[in-house]
Amino acid sequence: MRLRNKPWAEDYLRKHNTVVDLDGTHAGKMSEWFEKDQPIYIEVGSGMGQFITELAAQHPEVNFVSLERDKNVMIRVLDKVLEKDLQNIKLICNDAMELTDYFKDGEVDRVYLNFSDPWPKKRHAKRRLTYHSFLALYKAILKDEGEIHFKTDNRGLFAYSLESMSQFGMYFTKINLNLHDEDDEDNIETEYELKFADKGSRIYRMEAKFH
């Protein structure tokens, strides 16, 4: 997601302690980020933040981390955090390839990947967040029973992700081929999901673990 550049975005983000890091200086200091020692769920690519802020509001017993590389997008997430007065969420403005610089091995309980860029061209496959190099990062930071929760409206990306994860040695604990037809009461919709669902698009979802 790209928004018009806001020259003031970085200064705005630095004013709030909810934003943990803009330059890597807090990397590997998870214990200092949160007041409570609780399970850690992260969302890679949070968009406008509707999903993760609603999830954090519903689950104060969990610590959440939003990873978003675009400062212009991250300010939207921060605004929602401040509006809801959430104390159990922190924001990181950086790329997913830097995950292991922020989290220690086995430190994370769950990773959310919601409506990631499908990068449909084959030559761009390595940019997909379910490409094997990204899966290796998730495996490093997740606990032994840690999970990846994945949602998309893109059938091609979903099929690719199932194959990529299987080849990487993962197994699936849940697969939904038409999420909104299954009336999942626990489902929290993202901004993209609402838009696609209103158009009648099918939403694909799965949960996976590493062997």
Curated annotation (Swiss-Prot):
EC number: 2.1.1.33
Coiled-coil portions: none
Catalytic activity entry: guanosine(46) in tRNA + S-adenosyl-L-methionine = N(7)-methylguanosine(46) in tRNA + S-adenosyl-L-homocysteine
Gene Ontology molecular-function annotations: tRNA (guanine(46)-N7)-methyltransferase activity
GO terms under cellular component: tRNA methyltransferase complex
Catalytic site positions: 117
Binding site for S-adenosyl-L-methionine: 43, 68, 95, 117
UniProt keyword list: Methyltransferase, S-adenosyl-L-methionine, Transferase, tRNA processing
Pathway(s) this gene product operates in, as recorded in its UniProt entry: tRNA modification; N(7)-methylguanine-tRNA biosynthesis
Residues the record lists as binding substrate: 121, 153, 190-193
Top-rank taxon, per record: Bacteria
Protein family per UniProt: Belongs to the class I-like SAM-binding methyltransferase superfamily. TrmB family.
Job of this protein: Catalyzes the formation of N(7)-methylguanine at position 46 (m7G46) in tRNA.
Protein name, UniProt field: tRNA (guanine-N(7)-)-methyltransferase
Gene name per UniProt: trmB
